Amino acid sequence: MRKILDRYATYSGSDPRVAPAVLASIAFVEEAFGAWHIKGGVGKLADAVYQRSLDRGVKFEFNTSVTQINHDGKTTTGISLADGRVLDYSIVVANADTTAVYNKLITGKVKKLRRERAKLAKADPSLAGFSLLLGLRPSENPTGLSHHNIFFPDDYDAEFGDIFDRKQPVQDPTIYLCAPQDESMVKHSGHEAWFVLVNAPRHDLKDGFNWNDADFNHHYAMQIIDSLESRGISIRDRLEVLEIRTPADLERTVAAPGGAIYGTSSNGARSAFMRAKNRSPLQGLYCVGGSAHPGGGLPLVGLSAEIVAQAIVGKASH
């Protein structure tokens, strides 16, 4: 029971040994209201948001890197792009990690940001994730798996000692396996698409673990598959596609520092106050995402977006 309740702290990338006990209340939410699956996978949510945005007249520029958020010391004035363009805007919404926003996209001494930068410097980043995407041929025998499956090790506390204290891959990790019975997620009938995730230390060459070693990553993936097969779950004889995603991959693809996909952790009673405000001290700049209020995880990130949208609409109406 303690393992199950401790598990909910990891939903926000936190260490259950020091995270607020209120996170265990997520168990009630799941039991009372259920956990929901989007038909076709969570990517369909992004498709729906994209289409809704197009319908509302939003213009998208993909594969366009923002190199700087421009300002006059008090107010946001726009953004600079990697291709040399400078775009003038009175409102900028930044969904990048707030540490990167305030220290890389906004450089130099900015009096209005002094307190926010100091606060973020004290915040603990979340843990990262090492994941496997598995494409499986049809099984001759029923797997007996649920949509969500969690396999705990004997020593659960050791996992967080490895991640947060020793900053090394977990020797015997808790394994989350998502095995959706959703034909729209696979190309051929009877095939399955599984998502396997274990918690991991951040990618950091100085103060973390180096996830750039392809040989180690493959070995670790095989270790996870071995652990699942030792529990009677057939994988290798059905395996058609294997894609490995490390914290280093997450850092490269989504610009999450160290692959800390939840932004800031909830480690400690005051952790919630260490997150960036949605409304930046720099007028016209808004922060959204896992490292901003109210925290990490898709549901909270959605609330973060709602808060920012309402703040902007409220400002425009006055």
What spans do the regions from the language model cover?
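Mid-domain catalytic core of redox enzymes
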Residues: 37, 67-188
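Active-site/ligand-binding neighborhood in enzyme catalytic cores
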Residues: 1-56, 63, 253-266
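Active-site-proximal substrate-binding core of FAD-dependent oxidoreductases
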Residues: 65-71, 313-318
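Hydrophobic, well-ordered secondary-structure elements that form the walls
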Residues: 93, 134, 196, 228, ...
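A conserved FAD-binding loop/helix module that cradles the flavin
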Residues: 290-313
